[in-house]
């Protein structure tokens, strides 16, 4: 999809292994890398941090390897504190406030980055597998919809970018 900037959530990156075949995966990572080089894939640093926290030390993590290899190309724009506050005032329930892990949830940062890039005139889509609303927490997909940012799962991203 020409001209679209993709802001990718850790849920989609973590699901690459389970949602793609061994045959398709190298093409997916190659396309992600070329999109990152073009400035069309963006990640907030909090997604990188979530990927690091979720890593299994005894198993190879291709998604984390890709994130770390492309970090300089993908983490070039960060939302400001004011931009994060604006997101949280609108969709604060994208975070489960009862969860006390001490670590920042990446979802508000994904949203703030997407809204910031939209404000710069870019055509932005969020890629996430987080689609299930809960009693005290809305999904990233729902929060993005409220904010007017289109959202697709990994399969939608792959289709739009012609990865098969």
Report residues per predicted region:
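Active-site-proximal, substrate-binding regions of enzyme catalytic domains
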Residues: 3-6, 10-124, 133-134
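Acidic, PIN/NYN-like endoribonuclease modules and their adjacent C-terminal/linker elements
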Residues: 120-125, 131-164
